[in-house]
Swiss-Prot record:
<comment type="function">
    <text>Facilitates the functional incorporation of the urease nickel metallocenter. This process requires GTP hydrolysis, probably effectuated by UreG.</text>
</comment>
<keyword id="KW-0547">Nucleotide-binding</keyword>
<feature type="binding site">
    <location>
        <begin position="12"/>
        <end position="19"/>
    </location>
    <ligand>
        <name>GTP</name>
    </ligand>
</feature>
<dbReference type="GO" id="GO:0005737">
    <property type="term" value="C:cytoplasm"/>
</dbReference>
<keyword id="KW-0963">Cytoplasm</keyword>
<dbReference type="InterPro" id="IPR003495">
    <property type="entry name" value="CobW/HypB/UreG_nucleotide-bd"/>
</dbReference>
<protein>
    <recommendedName>
        <fullName>Urease accessory protein UreG</fullName>
    </recommendedName>
</protein>
<dbReference type="GO" id="GO:0005525">
    <property type="term" value="F:GTP binding"/>
</dbReference>
<comment type="similarity">
    <text>Belongs to the SIMIBI class G3E GTPase family. UreG subfamily.</text>
</comment>
<comment type="subunit">
    <text>Homodimer. UreD, UreF and UreG form a complex that acts as a GTP-hydrolysis-dependent molecular chaperone, activating the urease apoprotein by helping to assemble the nickel containing metallocenter of UreC. The UreE protein probably delivers the nickel.</text>
</comment>
<dbReference type="GO" id="GO:0016151">
    <property type="term" value="F:nickel cation binding"/>
</dbReference>
<keyword id="KW-0342">GTP-binding</keyword>
<dbReference type="InterPro" id="IPR027417">
    <property type="entry name" value="P-loop_NTPase"/>
</dbReference>
<dbReference type="Pfam" id="PF02492">
    <property type="entry name" value="cobW"/>
</dbReference>
<dbReference type="InterPro" id="IPR004400">
    <property type="entry name" value="UreG"/>
</dbReference>
<keyword id="KW-0143">Chaperone</keyword>
<dbReference type="GO" id="GO:0003924">
    <property type="term" value="F:GTPase activity"/>
</dbReference>
Length: 203
C-alpha cells in the first residue's frame, strides 16, 4: 500500500502570488521531497503551463484542471475534479511526499474542502490595500497559514504593514501568519518550515 502524500492547498485572490509561491516551493523542495502539483484555472491551463515553462517540476508531475466559471466550487463544494487529479498523481508516483493544490482566483470566502487539503496556505497581497486582513472570510481567518505577500509594494500603495499586522492578529487569534516578498524570496524559508513542521516532515 502506497503512503498518502501531504496535500497542501494554496488559495488567495487573483494576482496575490499563488503561482509564484507554488513555483518557489517546487524549486526549494523538489530535491528534498517527491513533489507534484495540481493547478486550477477557470478556462485554461495557464498556471500549469507557467510552472512547466519555468521548470518547476517535470511536466508529468503537474496537472492543470479547468474549473469553468466557479473556481471555488472545484476546491470546496464539488472537489471531485481535483480529487481525481490528486489520485492520478498518486498513482503515477507511488512514493509522493507532497502535492501542492493551487486554487483558481478566489474571493475571500473560498476555502478548501478537508477532503482535498490537509494544510491550507492563503495568500493575500499588500497591493490590494491594508484593509484586506480585516475584511475577514474563511481564507484570512481559518487557513492554517496566512501569507501577506508583496511587502515591497507597501510604500507605493500607501499601505501600513503595522496596521495589517494588527488586523491579522485580531482576525486570526492564535493562528500563524507572516509577511513575504516572494519575488525576492523573503519569507519563503518560514513557509517551508511551517509545511515541514505541520506535515510531520520535521520534528
Amino acid at each position: 500500500m502506497s503512503k498518502q502524500p501531504l496535500r497542501v492547498g494554496i488559495g488567495g485572490p487573483v494576482g496575490s502570488g499563488k503561482t509564484t509561491l507554488t513555483l518557489s516551493l517546487c524549486n526549494a523542495l523538489r530535491n528534498r521531497y517527491n513533489v507534484a502539483v495540481v493547478t486550477n484555472d477557470i478556462y485554461t491551463e495557464e498556471d500549469a503551463q507557467f510552472l512547466v515553462r519555468h521548470q518547476a517540476l517535470a511536466q508529468e508531475r503537474i496537472i492543470g484542471v479547468e474549473t469553468g466559471g466557479c473556481p471555488h466550487t472545484a476546491i470546496r463544494e464539488d472537489a471531485s475534479i481535483n480529487l481525481e487529479a490528486v489520485a492520478q498523481l498518486s498513482q503515477r508516483f507511488s512514493d509522493l511526499d507532497l502535492i501542492l493544490v493551487e486554487s483558481g482566483g478566489d474571493n475571500l470566502a473560498a476555502t478548501f474542502s478537508p477532503e482535498l487539503s490537509d494544510l491550507t496556505l492563503y495568500v493575500i497581497d499588500v497591493a490590494a490595500g491594508e484593509k484586506i486582513p480585516r475584511k475577514g472570510g474563511p481564507g484570512i481567518c481559518k487557513s492554517d497559514l496566512l501569507i501577506i505577500n508583496k511587502t515591497d509594494l507597501a510604500p507605493l500603495v500607501g499601505a501600513s504593514l503595522e496596521v495589517m499586522d494588527r488586523d491579522a492578529r485580531k482576525m486570526r487569534g492564535e493562528r500563524p501568519f507572516l509577511f513575504s516578498n516572494l519575488k525576492s524570496g523573503e519569507g519563503l524559508d518560514q513557509i517551508i518550515d511551517f509545511i515541514e513542521r505541520q506535515g510531520l516532515f520535521k520534528t
